């Protein structure tokens, strides 16, 4: 089954489209994504289901890229089983309400790495990268002000290695990539407009 992230334009409701690859990718249904603005979906290992990053931001074609609900937005990460039933929904702390969860990656053991994009005052320095372990505990990676500010409030992509110990996050706005070993920043490098990142040879 191919799963696509979609939006119901008039209501703002997030949707997941379901398409059967054995039927020439015919659409066979849709389900609620668990939030507003689903941005990325990944399969969980061992046929455990799927995980979705709901960014929380409502838009409408009539208004272009204008963000319509920042005063009440709340992003989340939603977990679904193989029957596409919602099993769990995790949110960032209340003070992180304006942090839009956009990108995901999943390790071979089911640890979920995620990256966010800060929608609040850009002078505020907030965590932008985190992970959810196999017990479904959410952790934000805390950095010092210098390292955090390099990311310019914007994560463009994340990747996690097979073992789940290493997470890479990129910021095209900052032109920088960070690599974390669990909660510790261990490496960084700079490249203009750096963005897409993937794990290779897990």
Regions found by a protein language model. Give the residues of each.
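Short coil/turn segments that connect the beta-strands within blades of beta-propeller domains
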Residues: 46-48, 109-111, 163-165
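Conserved beta-propeller blade signature
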Residues: 2, 50-51, 113, 166-168, ...
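Loop/turn-rich, solvent-exposed surfaces of beta-rich toroidal or solenoidal domains
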Residues: 147-182, 188-198
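Surface loop/turn motifs at the tips and blade-to-blade linkers of beta-strand repeat domains
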Residues: 30-34, 91-97, 142-152, 187-192
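Short, conserved, GDST-rich strand-edge loop motifs in beta-rich repeat architectures
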Residues: 3-13, 52-73, 115-126
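Asp-box/WD-like beta-propeller blade repeats and closely related beta-sheet repeat scaffolds
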Residues: 1-45, 53, 58-60
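Repeated scaffold domains used in trafficking and secretory/extracellular systems
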Residues: 1, 35-43, 97-104, 150-159, ...
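Beta-propeller blade signature
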Residues: 13-23, 67-84, 126-136
């Amino acid at each position: 089954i191919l799963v696509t992230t979609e939006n119901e334009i008039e209501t703002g409701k997030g949707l997941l489209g379901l398409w059967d690859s054995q039927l020439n990718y015919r659409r066979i249904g849709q389900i609620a994504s668990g939030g507003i603005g689903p941005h990325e979906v990944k399969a969980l290992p061992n046929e455990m289901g799927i995980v979705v990053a709901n960014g929380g931001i409502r838009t409408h074609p009539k208004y272009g890229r204008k963000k319509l609900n920042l005063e009440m937005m709340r992003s989340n990460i939603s977990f679904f089983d193989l029957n596409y039933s919602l099993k769990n929904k995790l949110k960032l702390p209340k003070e992180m309400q304006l942090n839009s969860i956009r990108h995901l990656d999943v390790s071979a053991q089911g640890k979920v790495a995620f990256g966010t994009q800060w929608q609040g005052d850009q002078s505020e320095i907030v965590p932008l990268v985190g992970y959810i372990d196999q017990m479904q505990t959410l952790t934000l990676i805390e950095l010092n002000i210098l390292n955090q500010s390099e990311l310019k409030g914007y994560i463009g992509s994340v990747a996690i290695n097979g073992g789940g110990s290493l997470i890479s996050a990129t910021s095209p706005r900052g032109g920088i990539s960070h690599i974390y070993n669990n909660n510790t920043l261990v490496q960084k490098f700079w490249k203009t407009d750096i963005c897409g990142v993937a794990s290779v040879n897990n």
